[in-house]
Amino acid sequence: MLEITLLGTGSPIPDPDRAGPSTLVRAGAQAFLVDCGRGVLQRAAAVGVGAAGLSAVLLTHLHSDHIAELGDVLITSWVTNFAADPAPLPIIGPPGTAEVVEATLKAFGHDIGYRIAHHADLTTPPPIEVHEYTAGPAWDRDGVTIRVAPTDHRPVTPTIGFRIESDGASVVLAGDTVPCDSLDQLAAGADALVHTVIRKDIVTQIPQQRVKDICDYHSSVQEAAATANRAGVGTLVMTHYVPAIGPGQEEQWRALAATEFSGRIEVGNDLHRVEVHPRR
């Protein structure tokens, strides 16, 4: 069984009720943080997961709303890990991830220096190992495997999605993307697909062109549902709602998805949890 928790279902626009884009996937004793939107560690704390307890951080792409809290994750995982010889925190992402991590650690350079000077048991900077992928196997530990495939969020490139499998259960996390063959293949037969969605019917009515531009490289609710249908997934989990879903509007979004997908559809606020079991 895999457990999905929508830590942050928001967007680049700050929302008092929604943290930035981030999803937690738990597979047995392993915990994977997929993207690091603002407020993610507070949301993770609400479900009993601390930064030092993460098995790896998976980044779908390097847009600011998906990495806004990366620095906090790196520093907090370091200062709250009291092991004598802590293992490096794996960061898995597309090309460019190593540069972003290096720049983030440099930005926190003064803080890192202060802590090393103050605490005798902190003698080195945060131990991090970065792995960059565009496709193929990315993880195989203790019965959990992760596979990567490219997505299409152009002009943001490269971008990737993840397929996590454990004990016969599988979940795919698409990140921001328009429909594409590589995502269909990655998600083929998965038990669950976590997909970011926007309401293009609403966004196109907003006068500012910069806002309308987001329709170019995100999937609508119906497009995400059609991807789920083509891939033959069991459950569609929607997240990263643009615009934010208002109180009582969940069924509108669910109904739109149901025009393209007849399976289970999950629409939830932050901390919404979905158990994923292998389909028999």
From Swiss-Prot:
Pfam families from the UniProt entry: Lactamase_B_2 (PF12706)
Binding residue positions for Zn(2+) 2: D65, H66, D176, H240
Enzyme's top EC category: hydrolase
Binding residue positions for Zn(2+) 1: H61, H63, H153, D176
Cofactor note: Binds 2 Zn(2+) ions.
SMART domains: Lactamase_B (SM00849)
Alphabetic keyword roster: Endonuclease, Hydrolase, Metal-binding, Nuclease, tRNA processing, Zinc
Catalytic-site annotation from UniProt: D65 (proton acceptor)
EC number per UniProt: 3.1.26.11
Cofactor: Zn(2+)
Catalytic activity entry: Endonucleolytic cleavage of RNA, removing extra 3' nucleotides from tRNA precursor, generating 3' termini of tRNAs. A 3'-hydroxy group is left at the tRNA terminus and a 5'-phosphoryl group is left at the trailer molecule
Molecular-function GO terms, alphabetical: 3'-tRNA processing endoribonuclease activity; metal ion binding
Cytoplasm among keywords: no
Family from the record: Belongs to the RNase Z family.
Function of the protein: Zinc phosphodiesterase, which displays some tRNA 3'-processing endonuclease activity. Probably involved in tRNA maturation, by removing a 3'-trailer from precursor tRNA.
Quaternary state and interactors: Homodimer.
Protein's UniProt name: Ribonuclease Z
Organism: Mycobacterium bovis (strain ATCC BAA-935 / AF2122/97)
Native organism taxonomy: Bacteria, Bacillati, Actinomycetota, Actinomycetes, Mycobacteriales
Gene symbol of the encoding locus: rnz
